[in-house]
């Protein structure tokens, strides 16, 4: 026998064994849940590949588009390419850090992130750096930060948290619907003072989309859209440079060397691209004919060098990423994780709308706006923030996968414990021997015990243990009479009945004692 001193050690050994078995079982369940390609990583490999593919295309096109202007300004044709490569490394590091943060951090910290967004937008107005008439950058030594980029992400995390905390207010009364719009309008005013109408439009579209998905009433949704369109029109009409952009967008060839110059050069780049492009590095518009060729108009250079096929490939990758973000959001909502669902939805809407505005502006479909192409255009702030957004999608998907595996593990453990506890104490106490007696219909409650009882005869039954009736008295007398034969000799059929009753009486006694 085990001594008292050795008992704790034995218990610890058993716990260690159970833990190792649970870890092994969890790994097996995860392996069974995913195919062989995803077996090495619990993350969405497809999403990682698409994001890296867009970054790779981005550095190739940025290198090609920026060489002439980099040579003229910095005497180094690879100046912007090197910086963009550094930004990509920083973006990957930032994404890896965010990937280690649980979603609980974002759920609890989103109000503080909103305060950080407001602080950044106020700081850029006070000590920001002005470029081309816009004050949008904070200079931190050799690093410049475009404050609007992290402000977008921080606002979306706050909005997702608000929709979870105030879901009933948003869906049932106007007050809950208006509250997040007040926060949005405060941020919009700070952005318009820079000025940065493009970011305001993207944030507004994402806010509308999230409120609609959260269950806002339809009339509120349409009223908000109508009010937003009126506000944008008013902002355009009362600002002369914005009005010039709109008029040049409607007819850029009316002033091809003035207000419509940038758009006409971009359209010529698209026209020269044809189906398969002029070849990588063979663009003419990048020779400083097209301003901002490596930032806002990088898609025009890509279209000129890689043609319609190249544009279609980039659009396909971004579309896949957007659809995947919406799928992750829908999966999170179905698994009762609304914060993660709304945040994933916001990333999908954000990426899709910003892509549409960037390409629409460079193709003459929309007025020109200073918005980057996600993960492709030159710009450290945009690249890092959007990489962090992709990392959030990966983290949400990872936690959903882990939840699924743990649920499978819990279900398997329950089934195992039920299987172990299936034999009852009564059935374990009696030998599983087939009986010859089958006349047990009047005793349905004790049928299982009767079926596993051993064969007995009336001679094996003690009279005191039986609840005798007047009919059973001759049986007891026959037992006491020994070998003498009386006139009331018991038949074999009566012996069987007496044995059955004796067994059932014993079962009844055992049940009452328990």
Curated annotation (Swiss-Prot):
Membrane topology: Multi-pass membrane protein
Keyword Transmembrane helix: yes
Function: Peptidoglycan polymerase that is essential for cell division.
Keyword Iron part of the UniProt annotation: no
Location(s) in or outside the cell: Cell inner membrane
Enzyme Commission (EC) number: 2.4.99.28
Region span, Disordered: 411-437, 449-501
Name under which the protein is recorded: Probable peptidoglycan glycosyltransferase FtsW
GO-annotated biological processes: cell wall organization; FtsZ-dependent cytokinesis; peptidoglycan biosynthetic process; regulation of cell shape
Gene Ontology annotations for the cellular component aspect, listed alphabetically: cell division site; plasma membrane
Catalytic activity: [GlcNAc-(1->4)-Mur2Ac(oyl-L-Ala-gamma-D-Glu-L-Lys-D-Ala-D-Ala)](n)-di-trans,octa-cis-undecaprenyl diphosphate + beta-D-GlcNAc-(1->4)-Mur2Ac(oyl-L-Ala-gamma-D-Glu-L-Lys-D-Ala-D-Ala)-di-trans,octa-cis-undecaprenyl diphosphate = [GlcNAc-(1->4)-Mur2Ac(oyl-L-Ala-gamma-D-Glu-L-Lys-D-Ala-D-Ala)](n+1)-di-trans,octa-cis-undecaprenyl diphosphate + di-trans,octa-cis-undecaprenyl diphosphate + H(+)
NCBIfam families membership: ftsW, PRK10774.1
Transmembrane segments: 45-65, 86-106, 108-128, 137-157, 182-202, 218-238, 301-321, 347-367, 373-393
One Gene Ontology MF term: peptidoglycan glycosyltransferase activity
Main location: membrane
């Amino acid at each position: 026998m085990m001594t008292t001193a050795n008992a704790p050690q034995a218990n610890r050994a058993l716990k260690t064994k159970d833990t190792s078995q649970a870890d092994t079982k969890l790994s097996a369940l995860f392996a069974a849940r995913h195919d062989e390609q995803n077996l090495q990583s619990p993350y969405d490999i497809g999403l990682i590949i698409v994001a890296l593919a867009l970054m790779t295309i981005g550095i190739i096109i940025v290198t090609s588009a920026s060489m002439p202007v980099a040579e003229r300004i910095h005497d180094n044709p690879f100046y912007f390419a090197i910086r963009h490569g550094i930004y990509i490394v920083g973006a990957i590091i930032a994404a890896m850090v965010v990937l280690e943060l649980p979603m609980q951090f974002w759920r609890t910290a989103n109000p503080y992130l909103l305060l950080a967004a407001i602080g950044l937008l106020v700081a850029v107005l006070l000590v920001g750096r002005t470029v081309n008439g816009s004050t949008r950058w904070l200079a931190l030594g050799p690093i410049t930060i475009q404050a609007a980029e992290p402000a977008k992400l921080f606002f979306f995390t706050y909005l997702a948290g608000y929709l979870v905390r105030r879901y009933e207010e948003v869906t049932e009364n106007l007050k809950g619907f208006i509250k997040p719009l007040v926060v949005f309008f405060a941020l919009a005013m700070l952005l318009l003072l820079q000025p940065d109408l493009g970011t305001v439009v993207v944030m507004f579209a994402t806010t509308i989309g999230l409120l609609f998905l959260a269950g806002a009433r339809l009339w509120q949704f349409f009223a908000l859209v109508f009010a937003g369109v009126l506000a944008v029109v008013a902002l355009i009409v009362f600002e002369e440079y914005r009005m010039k952009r709109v008029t040049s967008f409607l007819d850029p060839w009316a002033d091809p060397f003035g207000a419509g110059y940038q758009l006409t050069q971009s359209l010529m780049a698209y026209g020269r691209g044809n189906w398969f492009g002029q070849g990588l590095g063979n663009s003419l518009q990048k020779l400083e004919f097209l301003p901002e060729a490596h930032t806002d108009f990088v898609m025009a250079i890509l279209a000129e060098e890689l043609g319609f096929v190249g544009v279609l490939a980039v659009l396909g990758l971004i579309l896949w990423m957007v659809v995947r973000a919406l799928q992750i959001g829908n999966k999170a909502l179905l698994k009762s994780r609304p914060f993660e669902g709304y945040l994933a939805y916001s990333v999908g809407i954000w990426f899709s709308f910003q892509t549409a505005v960037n390409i629409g502006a460079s193709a003459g479909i929309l007025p020109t706006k200073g918005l980057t192409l996600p993960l492709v255009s030159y710009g450290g702030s945009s690249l890092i923030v959007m990489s962090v957004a992709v990392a959030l999608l990966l983290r949400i998907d990872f936690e959903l996968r882990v939840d699924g595996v743990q649920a499978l593990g819990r279900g398997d453990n329950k089934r195992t414990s039920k299987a172990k506890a299936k034999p009852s104490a009564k059935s374990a106490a009696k030998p599983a021997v087939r009986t010859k007696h089958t006349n047990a219909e009047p005793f349905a409650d004790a049928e299982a015990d009767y079926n596993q009882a051993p064969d007995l005869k009336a001679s094996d039954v003690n009279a005191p243990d039986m609840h005798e009736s007047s009919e059973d008295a001759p049986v007891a007398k026959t037992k006491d009479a020994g070998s003498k034969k009386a006139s009331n000799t018991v038949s074999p059929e009566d012996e069987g009945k007496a044995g059955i009753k004796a067994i059932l009486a014993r079962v009844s006694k055992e049940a009452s004692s328990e």
